[in-house]
């Protein structure tokens, strides 16, 4: 049974990539440029050429997009795996010479003709000088390993270290770490043992976070606590009752969640909505009550399809979370003191993005409501530490049949990390 080998697939891929870059640079004089989405590509090979040779990835992405449009939500890990298997082409044994000829023809169609191909190599390398202290500090910073998540494994640290930009001594474009596999392992282990990193678990594959990310989560917990019992966006009884009458099909527990969200006065509140629990229907009832009380209700979700689904189900204006994150100019924030922002599928929201949204709400006097299902999205457990300050808030747990209202909230990072 070779399945245990796959446990090391991510780390092995990072090491192989680092060694390949090292040898291509030292032996052939290749230089590198940032990839379109992530990683690095050989400088001189355009994104069009890369796309031409990424047909398999494009097929998977197209199939996933079609599935998500059909089901109205993001695909779960199991569904992604099914798509990967379903779109796998049959084996086709083509002679090597024919393959190479085909590759050259495809590259030439996008401008990578023989002369340009030859120009990719032969660059003189002055050798890469790595300031380890600066590298570790940068990797542990806001734009580093925790830029999109809160915790990471050693395998993920290897990937991040291999792909982190290293400033060039001559002032030219930064390059990836060009040290080879063995040195990559040494640097990664030194980073994990550095003052910038905190070990969270002691399992076979430990989890880590950064001191900087703990600071982000401290801000989240502090803002959550400060936002309790603020009398924020309170909705009169008659508007809540009218909304519940219009949504008479709601269960008793769902009705209680509507009341809690509309009448507790917390600036920040969260709920866990299990699959099939009718969370958007519950949100629609809340939106009716808030709107009747004169508040402006907006919606958001991480993925575009989830955003469209939320808008269609609730009738509120919705944008992606990314849209809000690029509208952070203090002079033109999209929220104001009469706004309530509802974030659907909040379990896909990173702590860093949550921190930004909470700061925006606190600055403008808006309120924030989060609802999602960590189990549905395969979310990683949050870094809890001593984040009990947020435990005094309220969280509803929406089950497929009923809504179970918990008397105390888990820490906000626990929902969204």
Language-model region placement:
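Conserved ATP-binding/catalytic motifs of P-loop helicase motor domains
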Residues: 1-417
């Amino acid at each position: 049974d070779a399945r245990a080998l796959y446990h090391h697939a991510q780390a092995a891929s990072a090491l192989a990539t680092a060694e390949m870059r090292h040898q291509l640079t030292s032996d052939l004089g290749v230089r590198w440029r940032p990839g379109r989405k992530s990683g690095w590509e050989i400088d001189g090979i355009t994104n069009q050429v890369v796309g031409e040779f990424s047909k398999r990835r494009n097929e998977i992405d197209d199939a996933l997009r079609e599935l998500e449009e059909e089901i109205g939500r993001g695909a779960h890990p199991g569904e992604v795996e099914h798509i990967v298997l379903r779109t796998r082409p049959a084996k086709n044994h083509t002679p090597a010479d024919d393959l190479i000829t085909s590759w050259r023809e495809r590259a030439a169609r996008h401008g990578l003709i023989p002369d340009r191909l030859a120009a990719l190599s032969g660059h003189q390398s002055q050798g890469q000088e790595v300031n380890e202290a600066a590298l570790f500090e940068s990797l542990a910073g806001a734009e580093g390993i925790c830029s999109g998540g809160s915790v990471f494994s050693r395998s993920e640290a290897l990937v991040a270290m291999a792909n982190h930009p290293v400033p060039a001594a001559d002032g030219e474009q930064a390059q990836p770490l060009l040290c080879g596999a063995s040195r990559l392992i040494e640097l990664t282990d030194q980073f994990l043992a550095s003052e910038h990193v905190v070990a969270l678990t002691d399992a076979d594959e430990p989890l880590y976070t950064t001191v900087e990310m703990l600071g982000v989560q401290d801000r989240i917990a502090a803002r959550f606590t400060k936002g309790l019992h603020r009398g924020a966006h309170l909705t009169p009884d008659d508007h809540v009752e009218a909304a519940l009458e219009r949504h008479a099909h709601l269960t008793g527990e769902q009705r209680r969640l509507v009341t809690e969200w509309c009448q507790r006065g917390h600036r920040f509140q969260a709920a866990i909505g299990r699959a099939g629990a009718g969370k958007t229907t519950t949100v629609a009832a809340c939106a009716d009550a808030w709107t009747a009380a004169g508040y402006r209700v907006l919606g958001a979700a991480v993925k575009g399809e989830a955003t469209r689904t939320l808008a269609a189900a609730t009738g509120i204006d919705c944008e992606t979370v990314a849209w809000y994150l690029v509208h952070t100019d203090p002079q033109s924030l999209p929220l104001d003191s009469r706004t309530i922002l509802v974030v659907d599928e909040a379990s896909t929201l990173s702590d860093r993005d949550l921190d930004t949204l909470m700061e925006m709400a606190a600055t403008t006097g808006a309120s924030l409501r989060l609802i999602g299902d960590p189990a549905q999205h395969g979310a990683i457990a949050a870094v809890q530490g001593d984040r009990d300050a947020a435990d005094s808030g309220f969280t509803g747990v929406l089950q497929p049949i009923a809504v179970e209202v918990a008397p105390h909230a888990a820490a906000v990072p626990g929902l969204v990390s």
